[in-house]
Amino acid sequence: MVSRHEKELMKTFQSLTSCTDEGKAKRYLSANNWNINYALNEYYDKEVGGFTEDHMIRHQFKYPDELVSLFGHYAALIEEDGTQSITPDGLIDYIQDLGYNLEDLVTISLAHFLQCKNLENPITEKQFLYFWYNEGCYTLEQMRHYLEDCERKLCNDWKYFTTIYNYSFDLNASKQGVVETDIAIEYWKLFFEENRTKLSGIIKVDQAHLDLWCKFLQDEHKKLIHKDTWQMLLLFFKKFPSLDAIKTEYNEADAWPYTIDEFYEYLEERNVL
């Protein structure tokens, strides 16, 4: 049985996507726990090859004045035609007013929510208004509640945690599809060190394990991290959260990226295992 609220979400989904199939709308929404933004993301990725600004342009809304005003408070003029966007300075102020610091893990959730492609591009007016409007958040307080929910999910929802972890690679990747090792290490510390107590319900990596992984990359002069290594490291840490776990359970025949195999050899050569 579909509730009245769910029916309204289905109508909104169909209106935004021009999808005439009610069953398809229901499937995408139910698969994403009736979160319309996640449902839209999945729909555009699978049905039309990704979300673009064209989707925002096709669906013009009368945005609430308080939401428009909030964007204007943090935005700066960056084009001669008067186009406004939130630049890094404005973003720092925005995040602080939400009660967070730029280094907090949940800020990656914010970037993911706003569909930021990288850390260099500013946040456009269309981006900011469109996504917050569809989430029903028009004030800082409402946005803060949304991010608090994201924090909770980072602590107890493995699928969501994995999504944000993998997204952080794309956020920092170069045009060649790699991330500099120094940057990768900072993010690994963010995910597995500074937040290890909060995230102990999701994943807990022993400090010695994480430190040796980072030292291995630096000792072996691994300057770039590829996406497969990034993604598989999360599963590696999940399966082997400690050096003892590697010692007793690691199987060299298992299919891990070459860099992780090298890490195992590095540990053996130094008699760590």
From Swiss-Prot:
> What Pfam families does the database record attribute to this sequence?
Cullin_binding, UBA_4
Q: Which domain of life is it from?
A: Eukaryota
**Role played:** May contribute to neddylation of cullin components of SCF-type E3 ubiquitin ligase complexes. Neddylation of cullins play an essential role in the regulation of SCF-type complexes activity.
Query: What name is this protein filed under?
Result: Defective in cullin neddylation protein 1
Q: Which GO terms describe its biological process?
A: protein neddylation
Q: Where is the DCUN1 domain?
A: 62-268
- The UBA-like domain covers 6-44
Molecular function, one GO term:
ubiquitin-like protein binding
* Keywords, ordered alphabetically: Ubl conjugation pathway
Keyword field contains DNA repair: no
Q: Does the keyword Ion transport apply?
A: no
The entry's cellular-component GO terms read:
ubiquitin ligase complex
InterPro entries according to UniProt: DCN-prot, DCN1-like_PONY, PONY_dom, UBA-like_sf
Organism this protein belongs to: Candida glabrata (strain ATCC 2001 / BCRC 20586 / JCM 3761 / NBRC 0622 / NRRL Y-65 / CBS 138)
